């Protein structure tokens, strides 16, 4: 996905709205004054006058609309790394045991040499041992904001008749991590989120959150493989998740597996037999199918 960001005046804004009137779409972002989608490209005009075009045909649409795309205008492709970027990623949402760790990190081009020397990459490609070695160095060097939602708190917030579902809770966590990082005075040229839902769905859930920021977002699938800032967040978040999983296991006297496979079913059934449902409320995400599978194992 390509992203174009530029500043336009009131006259050009009015002309743009007229040109794209047949392609208007709704946006839940309170900072967006006008939104449209044409030829697969999403166009967002912010109240500040910032215009964002997102999609593989962003350049072509900009030319069609006669937009002033100068050399100074930022153009980001999947592997663009030459600007200051905030990248956000989460770990733990697919694991029955453990909480959800969300991290937003700010990477400046001057950090690239340091990151490449460390061998920073998508945390999914790195061993847990390597992650546990690299993460403390990243935490010390790279401005970031970490959030950890414990399983106990997760179960209070997520589920039937609860305030959040599995998607909206991640929207809330990503938004808060980025918001808090921006509050530290960070000034990125781009904010990238590893896409876990569509932009429209993200903005729908975002509407009920208290904290907001005007900066436009880029949603990129497998962003940790394309942006160093997201890769950094992925590593720090993975380490935070692993530490939490280990601590929960120590508290209960069991080694808790990552993931949501049969190993999780087995350990969950053992916890149920030893301590009852309260142990899973403390250590696991109850709405996962593993809970019922663990209960079924007890009856065999």
UniProtKB/Swiss-Prot annotation:
Q: Report which reactions are catalysed by this protein.
A: Endonucleolytic cleavage to 5'-phosphomonoester
Cellular component (GO) terms are: cytoplasm; ribonuclease H2 complex
Q: Which cofactor does it need?
A: Mn(2+); Mg(2+)
What Gene Ontology terms describe what this protein does at the molecular function level? magnesium ion binding; RNA binding; RNA-DNA hybrid ribonuclease activity
Cellular localization per UniProt: Cytoplasm
Keyword Mitochondrion appears in the UniProt entry: no
Give the matching SUPFAM superfamilies: Ribonuclease H-like
Enzyme type, top EC level:
hydrolase
**Keyword tags:** Cytoplasm, Endonuclease, Hydrolase, Magnesium, Metal-binding, Nuclease
| Positions in coiled-coil regions | none
Q: Name one Pfam family in it.
A: RNase_HII
User: For this chain's UniProt record, which GO biological process terms are given?
Assistant: DNA replication, removal of RNA primer; mismatch repair
The EC code for this enzyme is 3.1.26.4
Cystine pairs: none
Q: Which InterPro entries match?
A: RNase_HII/HIII, RNase_HII/HIII_dom, RNase_HIII, RNase_HIII_N, RNaseH-like_sf, RNaseH_sf, TBP_dom_sf
Q: What is its main location?
A: cytoplasm
How many cofactor units bind, and how? Manganese or magnesium. Binds 1 divalent metal ion per monomer in the absence of substrate. May bind a second metal ion after substrate binding.
Domain RNase H type-2, chain residue ranges per copy: 83-300
- Amino-acid positions noted as binding a divalent metal cation in the UniProt annotation, renumbered to this chain: 89-90, 194
Summary of the function given for this chain in its UniProt record = Endonuclease that specifically degrades the RNA of RNA-DNA hybrids.
Q: Which NCBIfam families does this one have?
A: rnhC
HAMAP family in the cross-refs: RNase_HIII
Please report the name of this protein according to its UniProt entry: Ribonuclease HIII
- Species for this entry: Streptococcus pyogenes serotype M3 (strain ATCC BAA-595 / MGAS315)
Q: Which gene encodes it?
A: rnhC
